[in-house]
């Protein structure tokens, strides 16, 4: 319900941005100050600004899906437009209290020039963010586990997470991801949650996506856990609304995963080829259980043969010390998106011990991916969409 408190602020910011645009346009040409321009522009602008709310209120339909997709771009456009406008307004405010206040900096020509720079910067940033979000990179890691893995001296695991299949991420993006995965010649593929984007019905082509996911190639198969967005909930600009109901996993989602030949391991462990364990954990915030809890990692590993490699798959990179103490050799996670958008990429490290990349916790490696998809807005600025190819050597 936080968004209900932020809604007046959002509407205020949206109004401020509209009037700043009008201010710039009337300096560019007096005709832009005519009602015949301002009224149509205001109607279109207000539709865009309210598109997240409109999509939220509409019942599920093709129209609602289109409007929600529009809103995924609008959120980013608003963010960076606001960032640049506020930046230049602050600079002008500072200049107003210096010797520059009586210079050409405050002339009509300056208003036109500065406004043009703001628009150009916002457009360039958003276009870069959109294209960068579509470009899935391969990030490679190499680790050594001091255990024996049967006849395997080497294992290649491909980690993906945060697909967020739905209104923003469709079959084209998933096709790109699968192509990247299959190029790695993986022994095992693991998906660390947020496979869906809070809605099964938001997918543009479920059968097409299913065909792509079924085509993933690996020696030991594909395993996954659910994340906090693998719950069917109403979502508005990143804020979810459960209306007090139980946050259980959607049966459609689970059946879809089975049909894709993806094995869900929520709070369970599997011994693969009698050589290594893969332990899957439910999500911390939204485990999808009747009582809203998940099993402790120590409970999941207590009966395992600790002489064999133990890999943990958890959506959020939390409880790293507990996971290391429980005997895990590698903890695979996602969730953070590495901040996804500047300046979030600069502050994400304040909230997570390992926001993205690889660290070592005692004898355990923590590997966190920035994810394949996006959340909120279809942009990535300062971060990359990625899959992680992890080469594991065994020295036992």
Show the residue positions of the predicted features.
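Short amphipathic alpha-helical coupling elements at transmembrane boundaries
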Residues: 65-69, 143, 176-179
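Non-catalytic terminal accessory segments
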Residues: 1-134
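Alpha-helical transmembrane signal-anchor/signal-peptide segments
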Residues: 133-148, 181
